């Protein structure tokens, strides 16, 4: 919860309650500003964490085949409406020189990047670019599929619709067969 101004968030939530016509001193919402401030500190904790730290500890393994962690659940907040979007991320890379990281580090990187006011496209690209920068693999593919509450509960109101984004780096950009293989494994 470092660098989060809880008091400012509480004041803002109190003002929102007043602005929509509610009484912020009403019993049911009396502690809402405090709860929302605590929740925002948690769901935006990625603002104060560098996802690349998870790729500092590298293991040397005689492995230059694909590594894929799929169905990594995540939750994020749309930066346009500050409502949630959530889904699954699939992260694959082909190590170079046997440089591998613990599998949990891929999931931690996804979580950290998602815990910011965010766009799905940016989550996808940031995770891929961080892996490329820190591990220097032969290639990376990140696919993210999510449902956006800004499309479900407001606006077009299309519950169940999914948005899919991908980031393709390194060998996967030019090698169509390798790209097709990893995409089929992610399904």
UniProtKB/Swiss-Prot annotation:
Binding positions for Zn(2+) per the UniProt entry: 78, 81, 150
Lineage: Bacteria, Bacillati, Bacillota, Bacilli, Bacillales
InterPro entries recorded: GTP-CH-I_C/QueF (IPR043133), GTP-CH-I_N (IPR043134), GTP_CycHdrlase_I (IPR001474), GTP_CycHdrlase_I_CS (IPR018234), GTP_CycHdrlase_I_dom (IPR020602)
GO CC annotation: cytoplasm
EC number: 3.5.4.16
Superkingdom of origin: Bacteria
Name assigned to this protein: GTP cyclohydrolase 1
Protein family: Belongs to the GTP cyclohydrolase I family.
Subunit structure: Homomer.
Pathway membership, UniProt: Cofactor biosynthesis; 7,8-dihydroneopterin triphosphate biosynthesis; 7,8-dihydroneopterin triphosphate from GTP: step 1/1
Gene Ontology MF terms in the entry: GTP binding; GTP cyclohydrolase I activity; zinc ion binding
UniProt keywords, alphabetically: GTP-binding, Hydrolase, Metal-binding, Nucleotide-binding, One-carbon metabolism, Zinc
Transmembrane residue ranges: none
Reaction(s) catalysed by this chain's protein: GTP + H2O = 7,8-dihydroneopterin 3'-triphosphate + formate + H(+)
Keyword Metal-binding (UniProt): yes
Any single biological process term in GO: tetrahydrofolate biosynthetic process
Main enzyme class: hydrolase
